[in-house]
Amino acid sequence: MRLLVVVLAAVISGSVAAAPAGYFNLRPGVALESGDSWTDAGARYHLYGVQSCLRGTYYADSSGRREDCGEASLAVMAAFIADTKPVCSPIATIAKVTHVVCYATVGADQLDLGNLMITSGYAFAALQADGLPYSPAYAVAEQVAREKRAGLWQFKDVQHPAILLGRAAARSPTIQ
């Protein structure tokens, strides 16, 4: 009986890979808020330099059906989490949100999760207030996805979330 317990413990612990020091596992089952942010155990996280499509914004799919753009981003993020078991590292905490970079494992390769989201066409390079990307590499990845008409870019009416956020900011009154 004791041997069975030891064998079970070894099998169970062997199937869960621990994240390297300074990193944490992004596990399936976290509460996704969008295709770029989530909560886990009361803490909020955001994929640094990534802007998902906004929930409540829509595009017309190839059959003309109206689909929620943010839900599409969220679904792809959930699939990447489930399929690639990302490992993340915090890089900054701003306004109680921890911004992270994550890598996903695909076969023997470790790939940047933000880059995967953007090159798949289901997320965008996040822009600073001055219009410059937080990550120039992500801006290049976005341009490649757009040119290849990957993911959401295949639909003519998809708008970059930065455009929508900029319009919303311009309409909101300034507090002085």
Predicted features along the sequence, with ranges:
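Sec-dependent signal peptide recognition
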Residues: 1-7
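Small beta-barrel nucleic-acid-binding modules, primarily SNase/OB-fold domains
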Residues: 17-176
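N-terminal signal peptide c-region/cleavage motif recognized by signal peptidases
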Residues: 13-15
